[in-house]
Amino acid sequence: MYSAPSTCTCLCLHFLLLCFQVQVLAAEENVDFRIHVENQTRARDDVSRKQLRLYQLYSRTSGKHIQVLGRRISARGEDGDKYAQLLVETDTFGSQVRIKGKETEFYLCMNRKGKLVGKPDGTSKECVFIEKVLENNYTALMSAKYSGWYVGFTKKGRPRKGPKTRENQQDVHFMKRYPKGQAELQKPFKYTTVTKRSRRIRPTHPG
């Protein structure tokens, strides 16, 4: 003989169903948030305040600095070389940057063939890079338009094509360095301690 399920059993089933629905909703929200962050990382932000910094990018492979020589790019610059001084503009909260040679005013860009070139106009997405800070404290620059393609150089300072680069290659590892004479101007703010002034006691004179 078939017996109807008890009230307790029904309540348990409803509770389990409710828990399952909550987990599904939470998973969807996590996925949506992750997608939102990825989209914001790749999308340019014209609302946020842009930051402009001046520094050099030292190539781990060539032992020299990136140079923007007009339309030609290399990594053969000595410390303090005028063509190695780069104006780096942070474009979004997702670490997107545009890099311009201070001397030539040409932008570092990567074309559709993966070749590094200099361009006088940096508004194209080919001139935007995603800055990645690696575990070894080096920095890698991935193209915002061509995902997986990185700025990289050979030991002789020649540019590597984007399709031949990977994040774990030393060819794409760089270190930020201030130009000669600029480090002193970039010192962090320091607090100074002020000692409390003691009250001066006037000597008493006998009457």
From Swiss-Prot:
Interacts with FGFR3 and FGFR4. The keyword Glycoprotein applies. It comes from Bos taurus. Disulfide bonds join C109-C127. It holds the Pfam family FGF. Plays an important role in the regulation of cell proliferation, cell differentiation and cell migration. Required for normal ossification and bone development. Stimulates hepatic and intestinal proliferation. This is Fibroblast growth factor 18. Belongs to the heparin-binding growth factors family. Glycans are attached at N39, N137. SUPFAM superfamilies: Cytokine. Keywords: Disulfide bond, Glycoprotein, Growth factor, Secreted, Signal. Its main location: secreted. Gene3D superfamilies: 2.80.10.50. It is found in: Secreted. GO terms for biological process: fibroblast growth factor receptor signaling pathway; neurogenesis; positive regulation of cell population proliferation; positive regulation of MAPK cascade; regulation of cell migration. PANTHER family: FIBROBLAST GROWTH FACTOR. Residues 1-27 form the signal peptide. GO terms for molecular function: growth factor activity; type 1 fibroblast growth factor receptor binding; type 2 fibroblast growth factor receptor binding. One of its GO terms (cellular component) is extracellular space.
